[in-house]
Amino acid sequence: MALTLDIVTPEKRVLSVQVDEVRAPGVQGGFGVRLNHEPFMTALEPGRLTYVEGGREHHYAVGGGFLQVADNRVIVLADTAEAAGEIDVDRARKAFEDAQNRLLQLTEQDEGHSAESARVRRAAARLTVAGR
């Protein structure tokens, strides 16, 4: 028996697979889910979502969202989700630099600061997952 992992974004169902374990970036810290985990739901931070399938790790960059665990099923409703091998590193690097430069022009009280900060975190997550 295994966990069912579904990753869904507003655009599409990204993934539906049987896995041994899921590790994700929760807003209160990273966590792991294995078979027969207690039900819960949490918000996700932009970061690396990892799942283990047959002893092999697979990595996705998620741009935040929510994760629910119930009945050996993990459902991820992500703002964005990209497999490590699908990330365009040059585009991610440019997005990171552009967002960082815009963020430097703002104070924490400025409108748009939190949105720009989130863009920096999403781009940083993509670069980290891509291994750059």
From Swiss-Prot:
The keyword Nuclease does not apply. Keywords: ATP synthesis, Cell inner membrane, Cell membrane, CF(1), Hydrogen ion transport, Ion transport, Membrane, Transport. One of its GO terms (cellular component) is plasma membrane. It is a peripheral membrane protein. InterPro entries: ATP_synth_F1_dsu/esu (IPR001469), ATP_synth_F1_dsu/esu_N (IPR020546), ATP_synth_F1_esu_C (IPR020547), ATPsynth_dsu/esu_N (IPR036771). Pfam families: ATP-synt_DE, ATP-synt_DE_N. It is found in: Cell inner membrane. It comes from the Bacteria. One of its GO terms (molecular function) is proton-transporting ATP synthase activity, rotational mechanism. HAMAP family: ATP_synth_epsil_bac. F-type ATPases have 2 components, CF(1) - the catalytic core - and CF(0) - the membrane proton channel. CF(1) has five subunits: alpha(3), beta(3), gamma(1), delta(1), epsilon(1). CF(0) has three main subunits: a, b and c. Produces ATP from ADP in the presence of a proton gradient across the membrane. Belongs to the ATPase epsilon chain family. This is ATP synthase epsilon chain. It comes from Anaeromyxobacter dehalogenans (strain 2CP-C). The gene is atpC.
